[in-house]
């Protein structure tokens, strides 16, 4: 049986990346909440670039 999580960096960044979050009002709310909480990584885009 094929597993459900088939990682792809491109898909991950397009769906959960910083620019994707900035596109919608809800996404901007997520970012503002994470800033208020003091998160070091706001989005998955903030992880170390390996590619």
Curated annotation (Swiss-Prot):
Any Pfam family: Ribosomal_L34
Which family would the database say this protein is a member of? Belongs to the bacterial ribosomal protein bL34 family.
Domain of life the protein comes from? Bacteria
HAMAP family xrefs? Ribosomal_bL34
Q: Identify the PROSITE patterns for this entry.
A: RIBOSOMAL_L34
The record's gene field reads rpmH
Any one Gene Ontology MF annotation carried by this entry is: structural constituent of ribosome
- Give the CC-aspect GO terms: ribonucleoprotein complex; ribosome
Any single biological process term in GO: translation
Task: Write the protein's name.
Answer: Large ribosomal subunit protein bL34
Alphabetized, the UniProt keywords read: Ribonucleoprotein, Ribosomal protein
Q: Which organism is it from?
A: Borreliella afzelii (strain PKo) (Borrelia afzelii)
């Amino acid at each position: 049986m094929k597993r459900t999580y088939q990682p792809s960096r491109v898909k991950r960044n397009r769906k959960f990346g910083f620019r994707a979050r900035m596109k919608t009002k809800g996404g901007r709310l997520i970012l503002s909440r994470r800033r208020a909480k003091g998160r070091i990584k706001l989005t998955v885009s903030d992880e170390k670039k390996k590619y």
